[in-house]
Amino acid sequence: VATANAVSYCGAKPNFVDIEESSLGMDPEALRNYLKNNTEQRSGICFNHNTGCQVRAMIPVHIFGHPCDLEGLSAVAKDFNLTLIEDATESLGSIYQGQHTGTFGLIGTLSFNGNKTITTGGGGAILTDDSELAKKAKHLTTTAKIPHRWKYVHDEVGFNYRMPNLN
């Protein structure tokens, strides 16, 4: 639910496809078939036939430490010009083809909620090697406050997602 909620918080609408029995993760062929039957490319951008909305990303969830077929999903992402974002919360420490889950896409996410592999009671982490994206994420998760010694100026709607010192 948390992954779908994150999509909704951004004003987007999540769409769902079947999972693979072997990994319990998103099935690349089911995704490819869904995209073939429900989307079209316009100037290299993927749009949903039914809603007219742009399809921008896929978010596979690695379940119970089992990595999704990232090779297959990466191929679909490339073919349909989609961003790969991984929910690696339940696969912390898992390896796929010699690489940690959560590091294949533009973004990987981890949760440290009380019921997760590593817990701090709450909070999480964003994994990315894109320095501009990391800078933007840090800005938004710290209330979008512009650094200043005494002024409190916020240049956009931000969030207070800092982890407390007790964590």
Where are these regions (language model features)?
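Active-site region of PLP-dependent enzymes
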Residues: 91-97, 104-167
